[in-house]
Amino acid sequence: MENGIDQSQLAQIEKIASNKINQDFEEAVEEDDPTEDSLTEHIFAPTEVLEEKGERSPEEKEPTVMVDSALFAIRELMESDDRCLLYGQDVGGRLGGVFREAATLAQQFGDDRVFNTPIQEAFIVGSTVGMSAVGLKPIVEVQFADYIWPGLNQLFTEVSRSNYLTQGKWPVSMILRVPIGAYGSGGPYH
């Protein structure tokens, strides 16, 4: 074949994969069903912060608006961990978010870590499972809350259950940003 892999090599790869799948399937069938007690295993621990402490408006600090606070938090995360990515609808360098809240992040972190996605909410939310499985820390944005509905299936069925269903092997570490209430309404679809 043009990329240097011939049919016999592909057949060998397929045979190895098929054997692995069959072996894993047999192993899974032999496992016991989950018990009621296992429902509390492989869940994320609650935060140690159980009550608000400290000053919300320190005297030595200038007031900030919510969008700036979110930008500062994302920047802080991305500076502290190279595995953090920001992606979603119009968050890349050209626009930087519909409210321009991420305008400087693409310049600071580059197009490999801050980038646009297609207008497909289910993909944006669902892709965080795969990104997390390979060790990345996705921060994703759906353009407006009006458009979140296709992504909710992924949030409810994949993101929220991944850690439990994989017995802690694929904990999904993600942040989902969904702006709401700024102005106007978009209806159920773009």
Kindly label every feature range from the protein language model.
Residues 1-30, 40-190, ...:
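Thiamine diphosphate
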Residues 15-58:
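Terminal amphipathic helices with adjacent charged low-complexity linkers/tails
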